[in-house]
Amino acid sequence: MKFGKFSFRRKITSYTKVQSIVSDFIRCKPVFIKRKRIQGLTLLNVGCGPFPNKSFINLDYCWTPEIDICWDITRKPYPIESASLEGIYTEHCLEHIGFNDFENNMREFFRLLKPGGTVRIIMPDGEIYLDIYQRKKNGEQVLMPHEETYLTPMARINGIFRNHGHRFIYDFDTVKKLLEKAGFKDIKKESYLQGRDKFLLIDTESRAIESLYVEASK
């Protein structure tokens, strides 16, 4: 395997190929969980990617040095004790897994949360794109998020549904029904940096224009 140009100024763990090798080796192996660092933490960030937060247990499919748990959330239950979390946060992650896996994860979230705990789910909002598409067909001069890089509005629709490894794009009604099915209550559509638990408001500003924000309680 070629690693490309090497620099002594970079840590070896900063190379994408190194991270990929480590990910494949440690993924879903509890022995590699950073249990000492996450001891006592009651907030979970699912799919944190390159934006881990020290106040959270940071879980991702791809390993980097800051990841606490390298895990495939479509293969095994979360390696976290039931009813041990105050909050769960996930931003632009769950659209990358299949519909059935999403449903399974809602049940897992319910298991992990303490009574009264909150889940905050952020993902691309299919309704935003479809609504703007119809408005454009009706003659309005409006643009979908990031539409300028696509050939036509329909190409943009396909982009949000198919690009970047997306498996399923949701609207509020679909997420609400799946949360209800898992046992959640008080399910509400929120907005950027608005929600019931201030500790879960770590949203990425650049994603606000296209995102669906949903919160629910156990």
Mark where each language-model region is.
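Conserved SAM-binding loop
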Residues: 41-131, 214-218
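S-adenosyl-L-methionine-dependent methyltransferase catalytic module, highlighting the catalytic core
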Residues: 101-104, 108-114, 118-217
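Short, flexible hinge/linker loops that cap or flank conserved catalytic cores
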Residues: 36-37, 50, 206
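Membrane-proximal basic amphipathic "stem/tether" segments
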Residues: 1-40
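Generic, low-specificity signal for short hydrophobic/alpha-helical stretches with a mild N-terminal bias
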Residues: 28, 38-41, 91, 157, ...
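Solvent-exposed, charged interface segments at domain starts and junctions
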Residues: 1-2, 48-49, 53, 60, ...
